[in-house]
Amino acid sequence: MVPAESNAVQAKLAKTLQRFENKIKAGDYYEAHQTLRTIANRYVRSKSYEHAIELISQGALSFLKAKQGGSGTDLIFYLLEVYDLAEVKVDDISVARLVRLIAELDPSEPNLKDVITGMNNWSIKFSEYKFGDPYLHNTIGSKLLEGDFVYEAERYFMLGTHDSMIKYVDLLWDWLCQVDDIEDSTVAEFFSRLVFNYLFISNISFAHESKDIFLERFIEKFHPKYEKIDKNGYEIVFFEDYSDLNFLQLLLITCQTKDKSYFLNLKNHYLDFSQAYKSELEFLGQEYFNIVAPKQTNFLQDMMSGFLGGSK
């Protein structure tokens, strides 16, 4: 498209958006919605995808700001259709556009989970990330947490950015502190989520950092008896009364070494925990030590199923 034609189209698009905004301000939501969709359809049919995307995304944003969640989310779904049709790749601009929309979504919006699943499916399809874009995950996790979708938020934080990792630790720590009667095993229930989930996705760095933050908070709040010991160059916080926390720390280090004999010795030494975490250890045995499990366990497949809205 030559510059003059491009400028003309941009001017026309600007006028369309201005008329749309005027209808929104007047409360004429239905007509605004139908008119915008009709014009966007023309852009899509002529393969003017950039203009369609700009029109649809701005329209969705305006509806969300006007607290018209139904129309806003309808346009988000349409935007994702155009993203797919135009094969829009994951980059700073395409993700930022979605992040702006997520920020405006009401946490109680009935379509929230479907919108998020659609966004993430696009980022899986058009990025190098197996589970989708981490930056998008960070924003999604925060919005889900606003809506009290704690388990869903956990999944997205786990696969997000470094900031997401901090939020994930905060989430689990706050969760633990809400427990009325904390028993010895209660702490490990929450701590194990960090260790196992990061090991499942082979994020050793976040596993170590989240472990350190969590245990530091645990020591500061509950004052358990402990000593720090060096294990082959790795530091372990050895707890006198929390052997499950010791086991989980040693498991992390063992997976990092990828030494099969260490793994088997660890399981034999902590037989109770080996049984309690049987499925998780079978999967880690497959992933880190090439130990074929009697029954194949695939936590990553389960995770992917959850991301894709239940599909395999």
From Swiss-Prot:
The keyword Plastid does not apply. GO terms for cellular component: cytoplasm; cytosol; TRC complex. GO terms for biological process: post-translational protein targeting to endoplasmic reticulum membrane; protein insertion into ER membrane; vesicle-mediated transport. It holds the Pfam family GET4. InterPro entries: GET4, TPR-like_helical_dom_sf. It is found in: Cytoplasm. Belongs to the GET4 family. Interacts with MDY2/GET5. This is Golgi to ER traffic protein 4. It comes from Saccharomyces cerevisiae (strain ATCC 204508 / S288c) (Baker's yeast). The gene is GET4.
